[in-house]
Amino acid sequence: MRTAQVSRSTAETEISVSVNLDGSGTYDNQTGVGFFDHMLDQLSRHSLIDMTIRAKGDYHIDDHHTVEDTGIALGQALVQALGDKKGINRYGECHLPMDDAQVRAALDLSARPFLVWNVDLPTQKIGSFDTELVREFFQALATHGGITLHIDQIHGVNSHHIAEAAFKAVARALRTAVEVDPRKADAVPSTKGAL
């Protein structure tokens, strides 16, 4: 089983994450940040990665540390669950529409973290959620998951739709990238022999 559990405890947050890369997209995410939970649920459902996430943060300040630290812990869990990465597709991409929004995500599970973020969320808030935290989450996920991650907004006028399209596009790209190709199940997907 390609599974992992990660706990992260700081003066600002307490996070626990468990993932199953060979799951069916079941989820139980409770971070105390409603819109963020909704996005994490989409990430799980559309990647088919089972996720259970618990987070407690310094909400009296804002949601920044909770969102960022969840991205850190989830990235670390993905690295653990992937192990030596033998047999994985490694690459994934998705061009995803959601009403007015269209977002493209392309990623490489290369152990070379990098985020390209070409997304313009037109409002500062989605409900009470700070829209700048969408990028913060993906930056933390890419950095600590060793992911080269490109997210590009093609269209969109509604912040909720754009953000949700981004999470779903990344989810679909992850789904492809973590899948094992039986034709190369014992090989690392690199001519270097390691990732």
From Swiss-Prot:
Any Pfam family the entry gives: IGPD
Protein name: Imidazoleglycerol-phosphate dehydratase
Gene Ontology molecular-function annotations: imidazoleglycerol-phosphate dehydratase activity
Matching Gene3D superfamilies: Imidazole glycerol phosphate dehydratase, domain 1
Amino-acid biosynthesis found in the keyword field: yes
Assigned keywords, A-Z: Amino-acid biosynthesis, Cytoplasm, Histidine biosynthesis, Lyase
Primary site of residence: cytoplasm
UniProt pathway annotation: Amino-acid biosynthesis; L-histidine biosynthesis; L-histidine from 5-phospho-alpha-D-ribose 1-diphosphate: step 6/9
Highest taxon of the lineage: Bacteria
GO cellular component terms given for this protein: cytoplasm
Source species: Ruegeria sp. (strain TM1040) (Silicibacter sp.)
EC numbers: 4.2.1.19
Enzymatic reactions: D-erythro-1-(imidazol-4-yl)glycerol 3-phosphate = 3-(imidazol-4-yl)-2-oxopropyl phosphate + H2O
Keyword hit for Lyase: yes
Enzyme class name: lyase
PANTHER family: IMIDAZOLEGLYCEROL-PHOSPHATE DEHYDRATASE (PTHR23133:SF2), IMIDAZOLEGLYCEROL-PHOSPHATE DEHYDRATASE HIS7 (PTHR23133)
Example of a GO biological process term: L-histidine biosynthetic process
Family the entry assigns: Belongs to the imidazoleglycerol-phosphate dehydratase family.
Compartments it resides in: Cytoplasm
SUPFAM superfamilies with a match to the protein in the record: Ribosomal protein S5 domain 2-like (SSF54211)
